[in-house]
């Protein structure tokens, strides 16, 4: 079973994490079925369409992301690839959902030796020295 599925199961019930509906294995791949809030856009497309966020909206989004990261950490999960393309915006409520745990890992106290996320959003010293710690998850939150 892919680690992403295990991480999604551990975060089940966190309101701002995409919900795993089902998963099954085919002959050469694993199929993951997740909820799709309607109507929604990822945060990148939302900003592209609507322009710069107001200060109030940016503050609201930032608060939601931080609360979600903290909730994931309490469940022993670190996302490691938080970026605008991995946040869905519900267009009716402006609630966010964190998606794509494919770069995630189980939370641990020591440094991480691997990284699968997008280098653009990583902290360079951690990439150079191949160290990834829990604090990086919050340092990478940008709006």
What name fits each language-model region?
Residues 61-62:
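Activation segment signature within eukaryotic-like protein kinase domains
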Residues 27-35, 44:
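A conserved loop-to-beta-strand element in the N-lobe of protein kinase catalytic cores
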Residues 73-90:
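Catalytic-loop of the protein kinase fold
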